[in-house]
Amino acid sequence: MKVYIIGKVTGLHYQQCCEQFEEAHVKLEERGHKVVNPMRIVPEGTGWIEAMKICLRELIDCEAFYRLPNALTSKGALCELFVATELKLTEIL
């Protein structure tokens, strides 16, 4: 299943975000999923609006999403969660 990782990025240290998303990425791959990791597809330093455009294009092509624990504290992640749930993507627990 193609799974998109949703989590907070803005306001956190770049390296901390990379580590959190990468940990989830590895876990999901080990479970047999094809993973879309925003930290791998959005270049460091990209502005918020452009990053969201990149991420949302990728999200709508996925079948499922995985939510990091910090996702509910992020405007961008909440936007992604809204889109994912409205498109009836499966949440991977």
Where in the sequence are the language-model features?
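Conserved catalytic or regulatory cores that recognize and/or transform ribose-phosphate-containing ligands
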Residues: 1-93
